[in-house]
């Protein structure tokens, strides 16, 4: 839930971030979010073609890509083309995370429990959405929308630390 919390600290406030911090007009924000989604589709294509032979790089990117995007978005926001590039990278990162984590849940769950495991994963994911929006809201109201992505980045550091310390040894056997 921590990586999803990090994601939604930033993503829940991406529209006002892009308008206020990056200075984008409404129409550009719309197209940047379309690009974010299209980039996610690119991630799906790469996943389909490469995941079976390259589990580890996909897993590492799934854990670290969202945090990297959240970190880069703040300084990139001073230059609109850089902001657009980071948003595309972010779309790739979140879709990679979603695909890899769902695959891992299916892979590690006993066949008879896959449905329950996926339902549990969905519940945990939704907890991350809510907690990310909540934390992002606190940040937005207390110090400004421009810091929501950095708050998400800080949460992603905790998520990465937990993953590399506790979860990676279990996933990689």
Residue ranges and their predicted role:
Residues 1-33:
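Extracytoplasmic gate region of multi-pass secondary transporters
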Residues 34-38, 126-127:
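Short hydrophobic/small-residue motifs within alpha-helical transmembrane segments
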Residues 42-55, 140:
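Helix-to-loop junctions at the C-terminal end of transmembrane segments
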Residues 57-72, 153:
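Structural signature of the two symmetry-related core transmembrane helices
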Residues 81-96:
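Hydrophobic core of transmembrane alpha-helices in multi-pass small-molecule transporters
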Residues 96-110:
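Intracellular juxtamembrane helix-capping segments at the cytosolic ends
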Residues 106-145, 152:
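A late C-terminal transmembrane helix in Major Facilitator Superfamily
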Residues 153-173:
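Multi-pass alpha-helical transporter architecture, strongest
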């Amino acid at each position: 839930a921590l990586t999803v919390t990090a994601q939604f600290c930033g993503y829940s406030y991406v529209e006002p971030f892009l308008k206020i911090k990056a200075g984008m007009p409404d129409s550009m924000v719309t197209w940047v979010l379309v690009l974010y989604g299209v980039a996610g589709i690119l991630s799906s294509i790469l996943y389909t073609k490469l995941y079976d032979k390259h589990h580890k790089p996909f897993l590492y990117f799934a854990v670290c890509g969202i945090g990297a995007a959240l970190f880069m978005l703040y300084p990139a926001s001073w230059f609109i083309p850089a902001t657009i590039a980071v948003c595309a990278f972010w779309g790739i990162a979140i879709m990679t995370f979603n695909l890899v984590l769902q695959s891992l849940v299916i892979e590690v769950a006993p066949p008879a429990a896959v449905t329950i495991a996926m339902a549990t994963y969905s519940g945990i994911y939704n907890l991350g959405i809510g907690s990310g929006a909540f934390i992002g809201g606190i940040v937005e109201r207390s110090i400004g929308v421009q810091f929501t992505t950095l708050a998400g980045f800080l949460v992603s550091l905790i998520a990465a630390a937990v993953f590399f310390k506790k979860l990676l040894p279990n996933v990689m056997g």
